[in-house]
Amino acid sequence: MTTTQQPNLFLTKIIFEPQLVENENFGVVTDIDPIVDGHYLFYSKKWLPSIADCDTAQASTFLHNLFARTVDVPYAYFERGRASFCTSMNGVLHAHGHLVPVFSADMAQLFPYGTIERCFNLEEAYRLVETQGQYLLWGNLGGEFYVIQNVEELPKRTIRNTIRAQQHL
């Protein structure tokens, strides 16, 4: 018995949106529901459940080189990978992360939901991500990153709500 994979509606739509920057593997577009001014969505052009399932060295290089040279201010990066809640566009999972202008130099305690693993950079953080299960990854591009494994119980909009709350401090 053969099964036919349905088209990824997220990718089918987002690749036709105006791209801030892109290459053959990744793209960055303006988030359609921005948390703050300058909120972008970083996505994989391959249909994968998380950025950690991509070539993470390429993802890190893209963000640090191509994206960082395109914007005028430092940015922070957030991803909740392999999250079943990430089901916009009729239940299709898609690998993506959120990029927002840096709002805090010390991001270590931003998400106090479990054991936080501290990393020197984004690429090291992705190497820590386990091959199964949801994770929360965040940090300032060019700075330290943090990972929490097994975050299946976190509320759906944890990243958005936390960033929004930080903007009002």
Question: For each predicted feature, which ranges?
Answer:
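HIT superfamily nucleotide-processing domains
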Residues: 1-169
